[in-house]
Amino acid sequence: MYEWRITLLKKIKHELNYLKLSNFIGAFIFVISLIPSIVYSIYIKLKDKKIWLICEDKSEARDNGICFFSYLNSLRDCNIDTYYAIDYNSPDYSEVNKIGKVVRYGSVFHWVLYLCSEFNISSQKNGRPDAAVGYVLERLPIMRKKFIFLQHGITLSYAKWLFYNNSKFRLFICGAKPEYEYVKENFGYPDDHIAYLGFSRFDAYLSCKKKTSQIVLMPSWREWISSKNEFSNIYEDTSDFTNTQYYNKYQELLNSDKLINLLKNNNLTLVFYPHRNMQKYLKTFSTTSSNIIIADKEQYNIRKLLMESSVMITDYSSVALDFAYMKKPVIYYQFDEARFREAQYQKGYFDYRSSGLGVVTNTLDDTINILHRYINYGYNISGYSSVENEKFFSVRDDKNSERIYEYLLSIRGK
């Protein structure tokens, strides 16, 4: 017991290093919400109500969270009060409000719902009214059974921050069979705290139609050049983003004559949509081509881009697996592979080269050549890729949200 307390104190001390003013404000709002939470908990017990609180990033509703929220609100016989937490200034707010009950992210009522809910369900690890305060609270036994992790993307790497000892998730939901086996074996989750149920957003993928004139370029972020945040233990101050290899490689791609001519000759559009952690640098990118769109996340919905596009170019992003789920071709442009493995994510079970779920390139020319090949072959994946695809996604249907719902019902009170 004593050793457990020492370990907990060390983890809390580590988190305190990343505290911001907003965290202290969050702690203040939490204290204010305690008495209303006690009153509200008595009320919902008298009314025999159960509350499920759902969120993603505080300003978004485009991921597994909103898909699961939509599913729950479509059930006629569901006796659960569901709330979606989102910033009222979010461009997605009005759409969420049409679906069901909304609560302002970080508000007193958000805290009340968080404390009184049966489950707090999120696609984000820090899906709480305040990440730092929630981290401490969920180390307490009374709060430990609440957090349901829908995930933002399929886990591919050896991500220590997702280990059970670090997360204490009540349920870790996996989107693929190999992912489930890897996380279960290596991340320390008890058997009933991890399940292969599929992602809610997958439900719409099987019925989507290709928009054959569109390619999506969707690179991930880089921890060593992104802003310091609660995810980051490695941070390199980059005073001029345009000096980074990341910027120069993608700027080179966006202005490649070879790519521009390929797009123009085939009447294609390429949408450049970098990871949200890199979106703040979006204005530094430019292109001379009218066939290339530099996409702001405020104006473009990532799920729609995935469903409409015919080819994806990414680097290490797990969003490629969404594309693979739809049996669409993926190119992994990995110009900084060695540094990425050293500074960001250690290699896990997923081998980009041998997986059969895409083609790895390291140079600009190879990337464009592979893209050209996919265009010439009608955007079809190879027979080998199709076989490996079926192995990776041993369950492929539109029942993912239903499975999640049924599983949550089965673990109530456990």
Report the location of each language-model feature.
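C-terminal amphipathic helix plus adjacent low-complexity
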Residues: W4-K13, S37, L268, G358, ...
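Donor nucleotide-activated moiety binding/catalytic core segment of transferases
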Residues: R104-V112, R276-L321
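Short active-site oxyanion
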Residues: N79-Y83, S167-F172, T269-L270, E308-V311, ...
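A short, gly/pro- and small-residue-rich
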Residues: V133-G153, N233-Y247, K328-R339
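Membrane-proximal basic amphipathic "stem/tether" segments
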Residues: M1-E56, S232
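Conserved catalytic-core segment of nucleotide-activated headgroup transferases in glycan assembly
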Residues: D63-F69, S200-T284, T361
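Catalytic binding pocket for nucleotide-activated donors in carbohydrate/polymer assembly enzymes
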Residues: F285-T287, Y316-F392
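Active-site and donor-binding regions of nucleotide-sugar-utilizing enzymes
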Residues: I51-Y205
